[in-house]
């Protein structure tokens, strides 16, 4: 029986077309198709025209025939580059981050020596100036909002403690070390420091007071760990629980 006859009569055709040829034959596809490292190595070493021994695949087992030598990728082709990048972004994100961090360190060194704008020009990079914003950890609604829409690289800084501690510790002209923000690596420089407008302070105070006044003594204690309370109420609860005069006698009372 020929290989083609065996495919036609006995193959389940998992991952192949009607002739037994793999439907996805990039190296990354081959790696995933043969989960066992030793079996993968066996397949890759199979000579053109030869058959492999039985190897494990994602769902079952297979015998592989190599029909041609692997072809080198054409990196001048945009589709190839996009596929490689998509694969790396999915399973080799750390490699991309390390590369960008190294590039960012180069930029940081040049910026500290010759200025932020000059360093950006030397590396063909754009300098983006964000709008001003306060320290608003969690992007709570009683404080001015973070620049999530206007500045895409800063879209997910709301709970990034390292970002806030780095950004708001910068001195005028100082350049930060590289920061990984989601899918971006950024370097920061303080552009301008502004005082908070008095009207903003007044509005913030009024909003905070309003949220605190909505608290009522009968609030079920069981909900403190499960319900999402307004930020102002959470801060009141945290302040009370952290106070040195507070004593936790729950167990003693509960066991009575």
From Swiss-Prot:
It comes from the Bacteria. This is Uncharacterized protein TP_0929. The lineage of its organism: Bacteria, Pseudomonadati, Spirochaetota, Spirochaetia, Spirochaetales.
């Amino acid at each position: 029986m020929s290989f083609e006859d065996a495919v036609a009569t006995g193959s389940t055709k998992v991952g192949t077309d009607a002739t037994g040829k793999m439907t996805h034959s990039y190296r990354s596809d081959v790696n995933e198709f043969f989960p066992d490292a030793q079996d993968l190595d066996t397949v890759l070493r199979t000579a053109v025209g030869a058959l492999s021994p039985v190897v494990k695949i994602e769902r079952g087992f297979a015998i592989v025939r190599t029909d041609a030598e692997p072809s080198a990728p054409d990196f001048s082709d945009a589709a190839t580059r996009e596929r490689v990048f998509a694969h790396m972004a999915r399973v080799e994100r750390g490699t991309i981050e390390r590369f960008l961090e190294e590039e960012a360190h180069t930029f940081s060194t040049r910026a500290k020596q010759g200025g932020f704008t000059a360093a950006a020009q030397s590396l063909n990079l754009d300098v983006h100036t964000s709008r001003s914003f306060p320290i608003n950890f969690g992007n709570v609604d009683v404080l001015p909002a973070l620049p999530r829409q206007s500045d895409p690289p800063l879209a997910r800084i709301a709970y990034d403690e390292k970002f806030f501690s780095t950004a708001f510790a910068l001195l005028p002209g100082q350049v930060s070390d590289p920061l990984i923000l989601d899918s971006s690596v950024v370097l920061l420089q303080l552009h301008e420091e502004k005082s908070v407008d008095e009207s903003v302070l007044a509005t913030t105070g009024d909003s905070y007071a309003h949220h605190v006044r909505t608290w009522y003594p009968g609030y079920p204690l069981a909900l403190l760990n499960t319900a999402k309370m307004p930020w102002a109420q959470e801060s009141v609860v945290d302040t009370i629980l952290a106070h040195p005069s507070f004593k936790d006698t729950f167990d003693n009372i509960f066991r009575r």
